[in-house]
């Protein structure tokens, strides 16, 4: 929102300089982005002048010799080449000694032998415009000899405020003035709402069928207006200083009223309208040519203004070309309305548009402003362009327009939140300065507040507390240490914190990553048989499917790292995954990791590449609280390498997978590095910590025995361990494999086991140990056909 400081002062008086004003607004939450002078460089020695006579230059066809009244005793002779001059014209005159932008000093000069005692100026030469085709044509009532700085109010600054979406009430000069009045305790001048001088009875019937989207629509017919009238200079300048160029008189008036009040308006050519005015939703694919000459096909959820034959405008966004005002328009239909913000939001973006009107209607316009703004516009048109004014006519839903929100605010709560000691009188004074209705409750500690119609962002007590803090000044609030009431928190011993899981992987050299929850459809298709959940409005096409696993994201991160010369990668991620199950969207949490490259960072000792068993050890460390972790061969996951992958089980239930990424994955996704090892686990299982049972430590010595045997290569070492543990030998405390040897010349392999025996009641003798070992060997011979080595 840009505005002229001088224009603001018309409603406040000369309050403070622009920098102080900017500081006041910024500290109150209305951030000022920029302060710029109206002219970048000051002008001096320039006055209002009037051309008395014009004669052709004797030696130059394109030059004229003018006699100019600059308010001095004698007329000035000035040579001028502008094409738009005429006798009686008033224009800025730079006298000898004047200084223009660029430190351009005016001196007495000769042009083709003709002396010139000054220069008549265009907007460009005064620094008011980047380009101008001729002299600046001043109004005929401009006082000759008046300093141009004073006449054009050039001692002014343009202030630009970056408003948050909830402060649509400040998208107008008067809205900013209201705010400054409350902040500085300056008297706010009333906005004059003149009653139109009605002289004809013509009206247009208004029919609102989209009552959920439009709560008020007013129209006014003005006939026989002067279509040759030029926009007054004062209005052109106010528009320019607000960042809006002059287009035509009627458009300029609606823009001026919008900047002043915040109410967007539109003017139609009355003679191009057929029948009633209808506020309705568009028919699907209904066509409309807009003012910028683009043709759009409308969707059925787009609110439009139409007559009985055709669409006229996209409501709250932009008018149509076919009903627009032209140079030949003499009869106009002026529109002012209140549209529900939610029904306008997003419509401009849908049709690749952004207008000042849509910017305001999307954020919300004062529902009680439409008719007031129309009265201001009617008076301006009538006074400047003449015409015969008809009554304002329309349709309105007063119940919605006059809807009020009542908020109960506790002064005790306000002081508790802000750390202040405000009394009820001060809080009431602040809220009344913001034009709120305030009533005190019977106990004197609570007030009932009704916000003004334009402050629809105020709904709950906390909103009012913020308003009091803003007006009082955030910088003046007392600094107090936050109060913390310590309360005993019962944390279950069966819960494992996510931070603990994080640290277990970080301690083993992993780095946490965070990827999008969306993946490329080609990843989804390759990794999963069932298609994932599609996103209706994706960021991009390659992020349009909700992830069913964390692995695709880790592989993408792995690719990005290895393509940038990272030869050792350890990454993990935890997060939500999503899938369709029985036509229901299911969300579940996972933790996954990826390892690649050297086992250790570069050092003086010989290193080795990370392998399956290294990552298996990482998984075992991560699952330290699971008392019955095991692994089972996995042959049915297409993106893991056959023979180098396994399911991870807890208490016999599958909770995850581990394995080497299949080479086809690397090929399909153009990854040049060798295959990494990955794992993924059900996070819900890991955070449910298993509490170990107490086991008494034996005071008797343990006995260790080794056995070695041959077994078929197809037999898994893990199955042998399971078979031994299934015998439930009480004195067998632990069994582990310490050597495996395989020969190319044999279909059998050698496995060496270590068994640890201990009794809680007595010292073991060899006979008991031998019996236990024999029991183990007999079971293994029966199940796996082992052959003991001696």
Curated annotation (Swiss-Prot):
PROSITE patterns according to UniProt: B5, FDX_ACB, TRBD
Record SUPFAM superfamilies: Anticodon-binding domain of PheRS, Class II aaRS and biotin synthetases, Nucleic acid-binding proteins, PheT/TilS domain, Putative DNA-binding domain
Localization of this protein: Cytoplasm
Disulfide-bond pairs as recorded: none
Reaction catalyzed: tRNA(Phe) + L-phenylalanine + ATP = L-phenylalanyl-tRNA(Phe) + AMP + diphosphate + H(+)
GO BP terms: phenylalanyl-tRNA aminoacylation
Protein name, per record: Phenylalanine--tRNA ligase beta subunit
Taxonomy of the source species: Bacteria, Pseudomonadati, Pseudomonadota, Gammaproteobacteria, Thiotrichales
